[in-house]
């Protein structure tokens, strides 16, 4: 029996795909660096072997899947080539694999992971559904009708996919180490749109997405009246957000989600529109939207003492604004404290002023050193450049987190795509010892 060997198995997409194949009774193993990542816990729970990188991992009879983070010079890739094994990159393998199912890609500059998780939750309650989420979560079922997966635009990886459906949440300028500008990002999404086989569900409130052309129907959702699916009469309570949905100006249903912020209403609308297209009963939608518990590292809360600690992946100004808005909606009587670790020097430099404006929406701001990519040149940029643009912002080190204790009833938002979690873990240790 063929064994799938994943080179870089701790990557979020790789981890999720390994879990999908394991659930479908394939033999799966992988290798990676020895540093611990949150993505490896589900691998360990499923008994999927994880080895340190070494060429001896490569053996006859394997099919090799390589993370896009590793080049052809990697010792295991070289060994696989020498043995004549089949080798595919993660996007190439996934692009072929999804053809077995009714495939639904979820893409966009922001909101991909949350929307993929929500759609998987709703569809999975109705019929067998496999899914691959960017938080490292994957589930496979051989009899699946649907395969829901997160499709990343970075380096145009999503052009490896030709899905039946595609949800497009928004188009924003990000990944400045690869994309030239917003027009370059749009061109990637436009190319993706031409590869979709049945229909596209897109946010009509997004100015860029309004310009998308395709050979299949484009169904728009949003708050504006000219959308096919529109959210109206939005009410925020202590339990979450209630709204009504109108389909081409006809009342379709009332929905409640246990989440806060306009972005979560939009994510829900995307799922409602896709499920309506697939004739999923409105009763199923209403029931399942109400019970979705969220995905990893997206507004993940815990209470310690009198403080609320929230872990969030927000690493772009748009995402930071959305996270702060959600915190203020849910906890209107508490001060919101932003603890932010910028991710990559290229992104920090490109959006320095936008980061400052987004963070100013918090009541207090703490900044951690920039988390740099191993592939980039630091240059002269430092965290002090961002601090200078935010009045009252403080610098925070992992060894001195005591200032956070001053905000006794605060909502502490630990935000970033690097290793901001180690700051939260260290702070939790301070509070409990």
From Swiss-Prot:
What the entry lists under HAMAP family is as follows: MurC
What are the entry keywords? ATP-binding, Cell cycle, Cell division, Cell shape, Cell wall biogenesis/degradation, Cytoplasm, Ligase, Nucleotide-binding, Peptidoglycan synthesis
Q: Is the keyword Cell wall biogenesis/degradation in the record?
A: yes
Write out the residues that bind ATP.
108-114
Q: Where in the cell is it found?
A: Cytoplasm
Molecular-function GO term, any one: UDP-N-acetylmuramate-L-alanine ligase activity
Where does this chain mainly localize?
Answer: cytoplasm
**Domain of life of the native organism:** Bacteria
Q: Its annotated pathway?
A: Cell wall biogenesis; peptidoglycan biosynthesis
Q: Which reaction does it catalyse?
A: UDP-N-acetyl-alpha-D-muramate + L-alanine + ATP = UDP-N-acetyl-alpha-D-muramoyl-L-alanine + ADP + phosphate + H(+)
Task: Give the EC number(s) under which this enzyme is classified.
Answer: 6.3.2.8
Alphabetical list of InterPro entries matching this protein = Mur-like_cat_sf, Mur_ligase_C, Mur_ligase_C_dom_sf, Mur_ligase_cen, Mur_ligase_N, MurCDEF_pg_biosynth, UDP-N-AcMur_Ala_ligase_MurC
Q: Mind telling me which GO cellular component terms the entry cites?
A: cytoplasm
UniProt family annotation: Belongs to the MurCDEF family.
From which organism does this entry originate? Halalkalibacterium halodurans (strain ATCC BAA-125 / DSM 18197 / FERM 7344 / JCM 9153 / C-125) (Bacillus halodurans)
Q: What is this protein called?
A: UDP-N-acetylmuramate--L-alanine ligase
Q: What does this protein do?
A: Cell wall formation.
Record keyword Cell inner membrane present: no
Read off the Pfam families from this record: Mur_ligase, Mur_ligase_C, Mur_ligase_M
Enzyme class of the recorded protein, top EC level: ligase
Biological process terms from the Gene Ontology for this record are:
cell division; cell wall organization; peptidoglycan biosynthetic process; regulation of cell shape
